[in-house]
Curated annotation (Swiss-Prot):
<dbReference type="InterPro" id="IPR027417">
    <property type="entry name" value="P-loop_NTPase"/>
</dbReference>
<feature type="domain" description="Helicase C-terminal">
    <location>
        <begin position="237"/>
        <end position="398"/>
    </location>
</feature>
<dbReference type="GO" id="GO:0005524">
    <property type="term" value="F:ATP binding"/>
</dbReference>
<keyword id="KW-0690">Ribosome biogenesis</keyword>
<dbReference type="GO" id="GO:0006364">
    <property type="term" value="P:rRNA processing"/>
</dbReference>
<feature type="binding site">
    <location>
        <begin position="69"/>
        <end position="76"/>
    </location>
    <ligand>
        <name>ATP</name>
    </ligand>
</feature>
<keyword id="KW-0378">Hydrolase</keyword>
<dbReference type="InterPro" id="IPR014001">
    <property type="entry name" value="Helicase_ATP-bd"/>
</dbReference>
<feature type="short sequence motif" description="DEAD box">
    <location>
        <begin position="174"/>
        <end position="177"/>
    </location>
</feature>
<dbReference type="InterPro" id="IPR011545">
    <property type="entry name" value="DEAD/DEAH_box_helicase_dom"/>
</dbReference>
<dbReference type="GO" id="GO:0003724">
    <property type="term" value="F:RNA helicase activity"/>
</dbReference>
<dbReference type="InterPro" id="IPR000629">
    <property type="entry name" value="RNA-helicase_DEAD-box_CS"/>
</dbReference>
<dbReference type="Pfam" id="PF00271">
    <property type="entry name" value="Helicase_C"/>
</dbReference>
<dbReference type="InterPro" id="IPR014014">
    <property type="entry name" value="RNA_helicase_DEAD_Q_motif"/>
</dbReference>
<comment type="function">
    <text>ATP-dependent RNA helicase involved in 40S ribosomal subunit biogenesis. Required for the processing and cleavage of 35S pre-rRNA at sites A0, A1, and A2, leading to mature 18S rRNA.</text>
</comment>
<dbReference type="GO" id="GO:0003723">
    <property type="term" value="F:RNA binding"/>
</dbReference>
<feature type="domain" description="Helicase ATP-binding">
    <location>
        <begin position="56"/>
        <end position="226"/>
    </location>
</feature>
Length: 399
C-alpha cells in the first residue's frame, strides 16, 4: 500500500480497451528514463496500477489517449509519468500543458509532477486563477517544462504571450467530463486553438459520459481507449447508505444526531450551492460544532489555508460544494455526507471517492428527502449499485 493503490481491487478491474493496448507489468517494461524510474520508486510506487500498465506506454508513443478509471487508481501519475518521459528538460520551454477544473487539483498535479520528476531537474508551474498574476508572468518568462493550470488563467497567459505554446507537444485534460461541460468548453477550445497542430491530446477522468466521449472527436485523432467497464465504477471499500429525512428542514437535526453518534477521523459534507454551504456552516457553529467550509467564491488564499488545515488534520469536518469533489486527495477522510444529493449523477462517484482513499474503509451517507428518491434510484441504476438504508451500527463501520 506504499503507493496508495488498493491492489486487490485493482487486479480485478475489467477494461474496454482498444485492441492495440498491451499490459506492461513493471515500470522497467515501459523503457522509461533512469532518472524518472528513480523518482517513481522514491515516490512509493513498486509496480504500475491497472490503468498505468495500460495507458503509459500508449501515451509515451505519442498516441491521443482516453483513460478512464475510478478515483484512487493512479490516474494522475499515469499522465505525469508520461509527460516526464516525453519532455526534454534541456529545452527550457513549455512542452506539456495539463488543464484541470479546480485550482486545488491543478496545484496537486503540480506537486505530483515535481515529486516524480525529483531527479530530472524539471520545472513545473501551477498557473491558476485567484493568485498573483505577476508571479505567473515571472515563472513563465523564466521557462517551465510543464504547466498545470485552470483554463481561464492559462488562456489569459497564452493571450498575453507569457505562456509560449510553440514547443507544446502534449495537452492533458484532467477530469475531462467537467472540463468539457458547458462552463469550461469554450475556454478549452480557446486554449486548444493556440497549440501546435500536431499536439497530442490525453483525456482523463473517473467518469466519461457518452456525450463527452463524442465531443473528443473534435480535437482527438484516432484515440486509444483505456476504459473501465461502468458497472465497476462504484468504489470498492466504500459502504454507501441513505437516511430518509422526508423534508429538507429535517436534514440539519439528522446531521447533528449523526455527529453525536460517530467518531470521525475526517469528514466532508457536500451541499449543492455556495449559499447552502455558508448557511450550514453558520448553523453548525451556532450549535457548537467545529467545522470549516470551502466553495468557489472564496479568495484563493483562504481556500489554500482551509485546504492546508484540513490536510494536516487541524480541522476535521469540511463543508463544501462540488469544487472539492474532484481529485483532491486527503487520505484520512473516512466519511462523506451528501447533505444534498448531487444534481449531476457523474458527480456522485467523485464525491464518495473522497472517502476510503486508496483501499481504506470509507462510508458515504446520503440524505434523501421524499423528492430525492428518484435521484437516488437513478444513481443506483447508473452505477449498478445498491444503496441501503443506514444501519443502527454505522459507528462500528467507521471505527
Amino acid at each position: 500500500m506504499a503507493d496508495g493503490i488498493d491492489r486487490r481491487a485493482d487486479d480485478r478491474m475489467e477494461f474496454n480497451t482498444s485492441k492495440e493496448v498491451t499490459v506492461a507489468p513493471t515500470f522497467e517494461d515501459m523503457h522509461l528514463k533512469e532518472s524518472l524510474l528513480r523518482g517513481i520508486y522514491a515516490y512509493g510506487y513498486e509496480s504500475p496500477s491497472a490503468v498505468q500498465s495500460r495507458a503509459i506506454v500508449q501515451i509515451c508513443k505519442g498516441r491521443d489517449t482516453i483513460a478512464q478509471a475510478q478515483s484512487g487508481t493512479g490516474k494522475t501519475a499515469t499522465f505525469s509519468i508520461s509527460i516526464l518521459q516525453v519532455i526534454d528538460t534541456v529545452v527550457r520551454e513549455s512542452q506539456a500543458l495539463v488543464l484541470s477544473p479546480t485550482r486545488e487539483l491543478a496545484t496537486q498535479i503540480q506537486s505530483v509532477i515535481m515529486a516524480l520528476g525529483d531527479y530530472m531537474n524539471v520545472q513545473c508551474h501551477a498557473c491558476i486563477g485567484g493568485t498573483n498574476i505577476g508571479e505567473d508572468i515571472r515563472k513563465l518568462d523564466y521557462g517551465q517544462h510543464v504547466v498545470s493550470g485552470t483554463p481561464g488563467r492559462v488562456a489569459d497567459m497564452i493571450r498575453r504571450r507569457h505562456l509560449r505554446t510553440r514547443h507544446i507537444k502534449m495537452l492533458v485534460l484532467d477530469e475531462a467530463d467537467e472540463l468539457l461541460n458547458r462552463g469550461f468548453r469554450e475556454q478549452i477550445y480557446d486554449v486548444y486553438r493556440y497549440l501546435p497542430p500536431a499536439t497530442q491530446v490525453v483525456v482523463v477522468s473517473a467518469t466519461l459520459p457518452y456525450d463527452v466521449l463524442d465531443m473528443t472527436t473534435k480535437f482527438m485523432t484516432d484515440p486509444v481507449r483505456v476504459l473501465v467497464k461502468r458497472d465497476e465504477l462504484t468504489l470498492e471499500g466504500i459502504k454507501q447508505y441513505f437516511i430518509a429525512v422526508e423534508k429538507e428542514e429535517w436534514k440539519f437535526d439528522t446531521l447533528c444526531d449523526l455527529y453525536d453518534t460517530l467518531t470521525i477521523t475526517q469528514a466532508v459534507i457536500f451541499c449543492n450551492t455556495r449559499r447552502k454551504v455558508d448557511w450550514l456552516t453558520d448553523k453548525m457553529r451556532e450549535a457548537n460544532f467545529t467545522v470549516s467550509s470551502m466553495h468557489g467564491e472564496m479568495p484563493q488564499k483562504e481556500r489554500d489555508s482551509i485546504m492546508q488545515d484540513f490536510r494536516q488534520g487541524n480541522s476535521r469536518v469540511l463543508i463544501s460544494t462540488d469544487v472539492w469533489a474532484r481529485g483532491i486527495d486527503v487520505q484520512q477522510v473516512s466519511l462523506v455526507i451528501n447533505y444534498d444529493l448531487p444534481t449531476n449523477r457523474e458527480n456522485y462517484i467523485h464525491r464518495i471517492g473522497r472517502s476510503g482513499r486508496f483501499g481504506r474503509k470509507g462510508v458515504a451517507i446520503n440524505f434523501v428527502t421524499s423528492d430525492d428518491v428518484r435521484i437516488l434510484r437513478d444513481i443506483e441504476l447508473y452505477y449498478s449499485t445498491q444503496i441501503d438504508e443506514m444501519p443502527m451500527n454505522v459507528a462500528d463501520l467507521l471505527s
